[in-house]
From Swiss-Prot:
InterPro entries: UPP_synth-like (IPR001441), UPP_synth-like_CS (IPR018520), UPP_synth-like_sf (IPR036424)
Cofactor(s) it depends on: Mg(2+)
NCBIfam families: uppS
Organism: Francisella tularensis subsp. tularensis (strain SCHU S4 / Schu 4)
Record-level Gene Ontology MF annotations: ditrans,polycis-undecaprenyl-diphosphate synthase [(2E,6E)-farnesyl-diphosphate specific] activity; magnesium ion binding
Gene name tied to this protein: uppS
EC code: 2.5.1.31
Cofactor, free-text remark: Binds 2 magnesium ions per subunit.
Highest taxon above the source species: Bacteria
Reactions it catalyzes: 8 isopentenyl diphosphate + (2E,6E)-farnesyl diphosphate = di-trans,octa-cis-undecaprenyl diphosphate + 8 diphosphate
Listed Pfam families: Prenyltransf
Residues that coordinate or bind substrate: 35-39, 47, 51, 83, 85, 201, 207-209
Stated name of the protein: Ditrans,polycis-undecaprenyl-diphosphate synthase ((2E,6E)-farnesyl-diphosphate specific)
Keyword Iron-sulfur annotated: no
Biological processes per GO annotation: cell wall organization; peptidoglycan biosynthetic process; polyprenol biosynthetic process; regulation of cell shape
Length: 257
């Protein structure tokens, strides 16, 4: 019965997809992976237990994106404000990030996935930076899913960094003020200039937490009470179905669509 229900959900998704407007295509999926600590606490375990048990949800999400030809997946792994958490938890998270990258990079490469880590690397350890650079270098020529991991990232920080970069280029005469518009500005963003189509946040929290503020301008948003370690392909299918049920207007009226 479970298998039948899952295939029925996929059939419904296909029908919705085929009848959607051409501009309503899911190219960029972004996820705020939330609830690991509360999931662990409900099981009387330390917070790192939740983080470790969330890796399977990451695997399932990546697999879904590959199967459904989603072009880009951005996962919010560690925000700039997360440095305020207890030192032991931060250390455990960084160790887990290193180990997961080390273990998963060969398989990601074999599946033609491009790995990129976006954010400020100045506070990361040399060991972790080395692993990030190895993963990026190994997969940079791949042509499949673009997997981006946001680490020590924040949307406001991203916009400020882009502004500084533009100011420096104007100062040396490489760029004129008249050349600055939304398109040119977006090219300087660490988070990239590809708009997010669908944002998912788990755990029941309903906020952006300073994540990809520029790129989320016209994103559809799906909030679920499910904790990230329990997030599955079935819940992701529901989120995608919700996305394709939406009428994306981009400033136009409903009658113009």
């Amino acid at each position: 019965m479970f298998i039948l229900s899952y295939h029925l959900a996929n059939l419904i998704f296909f029908i919705i997809f085929m009848t959607s407007a051409k501009e309503n295509i899911l190219r960029h999926l972004a996820i705020i992976m939330d609830g690991n600590g509360r999931w662990a606490k409900s099981r009387l375990k330390p917070r790192i237990f939740g983080h470790r048990n969330s890796v399977s949800s990451v695997d399932a999400t990546i697999e879904y994106c590959v199967e459904n030809n989603i072009e880009m997946l951005t996962l919010f792994a560690f925000g700039r404000d997360n440095w305020l958490r207890p030192a032991q938890e931060v250390s455990d998270l960084m160790d887990l990030f290193y180990k997961t990258l080390k273990d998963k990079t060969p398989k990601l490469h074999d599946n033609n996935i491009v790995v990129t880590v976006v954010g400020d690397r100045s506070r990361l350890s040399n060991k972790l930076i080395g692993m990030i650079e190895y993963s990026e270098s190994l997969t940079k020529s791949n042509t499949g899913l673009k997997l981006r991991l946001a680490v020590d990232y924040a949307g406001r920080w991203d916009i400020v960094e882009a502004t500084r970069a533009i100011a420096r280029e104007v100062d040396i005469g490489k760029l004129s003020v008249d050349e600055i518009d939304q398109n040119s500005f977006a090219k300087y963003l660490v988070g990239g200039n590809m708009p997010v189509d669908l944002l998912i946040r788990t755990s029941g929290e309903v906020r952006l937490s300073d994540f990809m503020l520029w790129q989320l301008a016209y994103a559809e948003m799906y909030f679920t009470d499910i904790m990230w370690p329990d997030f599955s392909k079935q819940e992701l299918t529901r989120a995608v179905e919700y996305f394709y049920s939406r009428q994306r207007r981009f400033g136009k009226s409903g009658e113009q669509i």
